[in-house]
């Protein structure tokens, strides 16, 4: 029997939507590929993160992987990553996130192994960073795009940004495991609850808890829930906001089912898993007008795309309109047609196989 090709996934932050994305992708690909994961663990990562993956998958916690740009640690991280490559001999390397892409391409360019990079949201798109920082992030992306590495964007919007750096690029929409979600839906016993607006994810700069808090303060008679935790938790000061802390994926889905309207206030995105899941759960989805979110939601067709706290509030007030019910069903259909993990895995596998064929040609 021939050996299965081996993929090394390098991940800068194994938590939130990226964690859900990667566990689903690994489960879908493990029959055709051997998989190895090198990852950074931060305060937002679940303590038992390795137990969320199939036990056949070797996991390397990269202790030198520093998100804050420490040059000494960056050099050590490159050495640590090269050590993993020398030990595991992967046939394919796929890096996820800005820091993973930067360290991986610097460390491994020229080794003759097919490499891929998925940004999951370009940092330079965030308007909360000053102009100098955004310029530096963009410059780094442009310089590293010269490496022998294909960028696989996770949405059409991210792909359009990528083409500003390189033509060695394609895109694969993120997808969700609808079968596992359906099992939760089928087992769910609805609970009585007040009208509830919710979001899911890390409470950090990217997810924009300041805007979420502003919306909650305006709608002070509505219950708001943030499913998750993070370093910006103290920004959620409105008394009508409940912060759940980190929950298991199944418990989080059950809580989502007992909520009514999903909002995503993010400042930038790749293609948000929490949005895809809420669309499948048949929740009205209202998103900030940013790359990634607006690639999935078309305003007035399968949800609302808005630009301000006032516009979020106005859209929430329309949740009982007949038009909103039609949009909810349109969003559900979109998931089944375009955003399943099976479709995502097929497209990734095709890209990987084409790269392997070129190596052996």
Positions of the model-derived regions?
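Short His-centered aromatic/hydrophobic patch
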Residues: 95-101, 119
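Donor nucleotide-sugar binding/catalytic pocket of nucleotide-sugar-dependent glycosyltransferases
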Residues: 142-184
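Aromatic "clamp/platform" in nucleotide-sugar-dependent glycosyltransferases that forms part
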Residues: 267
